[in-house]
Design a protein with these regions (language model features):
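N-terminal domain-start signal
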Residues: 1-321
Length: 321
């Protein structure tokens, strides 16, 4: 055990005390108005620089920037040879930037309101970027793919936005398993849910490059599945566990996939909390801290969208957020 892992684990536990957790998230989500929700957010680590008139987009950006800062702090404490760990956990934010850039490229033939383009400003990743901001200079979807292929992401495959983003999500799963082995079953379960969404909700064919990456994560038998139930039967146990909730639900299985998504979040949260509470100082502990930071951010984003809108039954919000 090196001093770097001890320092990063200790610092990580202190950062977790800055998250707002389920109760704080629920309070923002059930605020009577967006102004009330924004005021609550401003009193947390996510809103220290949030303008008093900020809209939801600005609030999401502020929350994301806060989490990036936390990951950068942790990266500074890691052993020099392990800097890729923080970069891997920052990948969802980089994916968000890439997807927004692809959307703008798709609309390049249309009139794009200047103020809208300004509001879509990408998240600054600093040293945590893998291919960003270079990809942001691409002027076509093919150029995006080419630039990604020359980066640590590798070629995601596909020729349109949906295919490229799918390829990157699967590639992120493989990066996670390499950098943070404790995430292996989390990644396998989440990947299986992703396959189910693509195949049986969106009805999309998964291109071969992404399919080969999927084979590495959940085995090749998913390829012959013709229904969600068939898919679950063909998955290894290490990947099929999120679907226990779906099987127990009434109604069509593919309409209950949100329960499987929730099962992934619950499992990751519970496992990661246990790891951070063991008192051990290790790569696994730091990985668990980073996972919990991402989950808290995701839940805060959900709360921002819910604040001041039609009330959602508590049990539904708890599941989705």
């Amino acid at each position: 055990m090196t001093a770097g892992w001890v320092a990063a684990s200790t610092r990580g536990r202190s950062l977790l005390r800055r998250t707002i957790g389920p109760e704080g998230v629920r309070a923002i989500a059930t605020a009577a108005t967006w102004a009330d929700g924004r005021s609550m957010l401003s009193s947390t680590a996510y809103g220290t620089e949030l303008p008093p008139t900020a809209d939801r987009r600005a609030a999401r950006s502020a929350a994301t920037a806060s989490t990036i800062w936390q990951l950068r702090v942790l990266a500074g404490w890691l052993p020099p040879s392990s800097s890729g760990l923080a970069r891997t956990f920052a990948a969802p934010m980089e994916l968000g930037n890439i997807e927004q850039h692809l959307i703008l490229l798709e609309r390049s033939g249309d009139e794009l309101d200047r103020s809208e383009a300004e509001r879509r400003r990408p998240t600054s990743l600093g040293s945590l970027g893998t291919a960003w901001p270079r990809v942001g200079r691409a002027r076509s979807i093919q150029q995006v793919r080419d630039m990604l292929a020359r980066s640590a992401w590798g070629d995601p495959g596909g020729s349109d936005r949906a295919a490229i983003i799918l390829g990157l999500r699967v590639r992120w799963g493989r990066r996670l398993v390499r950098q943070a082995p404790i995430t292996s079953e989390w990644v396998q379960g989440a990947t299986a849910v992703l396959v189910a969404r693509e195949r049986f909700t969106f009805g999309r064919t998964i291109h071969e490059m992404a399919a080969r990456d999927l084979d590495q994560l959940v085995g090749p038998r998913w390829r012959r599945a013709t229904s969600l139930d068939h898919l679950v039967e063909r998955l290894p146990r290490s990947a099929a566990w999120p679907f226990e909730a779906t099987v127990a639900a009434s109604g069509p299985a593919d309409e209950s996939l949100w329960l499987s998504e929730h099962a992934v979040v619950e499992r990751v949260t519970a496992d990661a909390r246990r790891l951070t509470e063991t008192g051990r100082n290790s790569r696994g502990t730091v990985s668990a801290v980073m996972a919990l930071l991402l989950i808290d951010l995701w839940q805060v984003h959900a709360a921002i969208e819910s604040a001041g809108r039609t009330p959602v039954p508590q049990e539904v919000f708890d599941a989705v957020a």
